[in-house]
């Protein structure tokens, strides 16, 4: 399975954060530019996807048809996970979709509600340090001015009863000496209700 965590960085085949998804219920929270729910469905899971963009949903449905897999698609805010009952989901993946969320704690509470106890929530996002720099490596923003800081992210997960068990800071494979990691990937596990 090849879950996409960002351009030119390691994917699921190398990081192994999701495990075997066959027979599991998996939600892609925000459709990635490489739709992960297709790979999830190809891996034998019941794949579900939620995205606020109607065009992303339409493109995902067409891709699912081309790959001859079924993906249950839902259009709505990333916190609108009402289609899944409490403690019924085995894995949630959000690849580069949480940065634009206005109310991250609300999204995390809803993900916590639908996940089974101990189930993982895998999140990939632009690394908070990478947001500080322009493409020529000049300083563009102060840390935290353009995105969440790592401590903001960590505390939001802690306050919603998640525990990080894996953190990866990934660098673009094309660069020889990167000034900062480009992608932050975390796996958080749902603690008790």
PLM region descriptions:
Residues 79, 83-92:
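A short acidic, Gly/Pro-enriched loop at the edge of an enzyme's catalytic core
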Residues 90-105:
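A short SAM/SAH-binding and catalytic strip from SAM-dependent methyltransferases
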Residues 25-80:
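Class I SAM-dependent methyltransferase SAM/SAH-binding core
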Residues 105-120:
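A short glycine-rich, Lys/Arg-flanked "PGG" loop and its adjoining helix->strand segment in the class I
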Residues 160-162, 177-193:
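Core SAM-dependent methyltransferase catalytic element
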Residues 1-25:
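Conserved alpha-helix/loop element of class I SAM-dependent methyltransferases that forms part
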Residues 120-145:
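Conserved class I S-adenosyl-L-methionine
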Residues 145-167:
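Short alpha-helix
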């Amino acid at each position: 399975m090849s879950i996409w965590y960002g351009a030119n960085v390691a994917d699921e085949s190398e990081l192994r954060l999701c495990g075997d998804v066959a027979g599991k219920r998996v939600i892609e929270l925000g459709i990635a530019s490489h739709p992960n729910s297709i790979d999830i469905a190809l891996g034998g899971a019941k794949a579900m996807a939620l995205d606020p963009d109607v065009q992303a949903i339409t493109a995902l449905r067409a891709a699912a048809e081309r790959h001859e897999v079924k993906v249950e698609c839902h259009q709505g805010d990333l916190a609108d996970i009402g289609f899944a009952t409490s403690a019924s989901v085995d894995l949630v993946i959000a690849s580069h979709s949480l940065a634009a969320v206005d109310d991250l704690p609300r999204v995390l509470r809803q993900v916590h509600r639908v996940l089974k106890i101990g189930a993982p929530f895998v999140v990939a996002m632009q690394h908070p340090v990478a947001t500080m720099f322009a493409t020529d490596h000049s300083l563009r923003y102060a840390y935290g001015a353009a995105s969440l800081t790592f401590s903001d992210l960590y505390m939001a997960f802690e306050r919603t009863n998640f525990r990080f068990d894996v953190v990866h800071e990934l660098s673009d494979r094309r660069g020889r000496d990167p000034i900062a990691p480009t992608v932050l990937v975390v796996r958080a596990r749902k603690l008790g209700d």
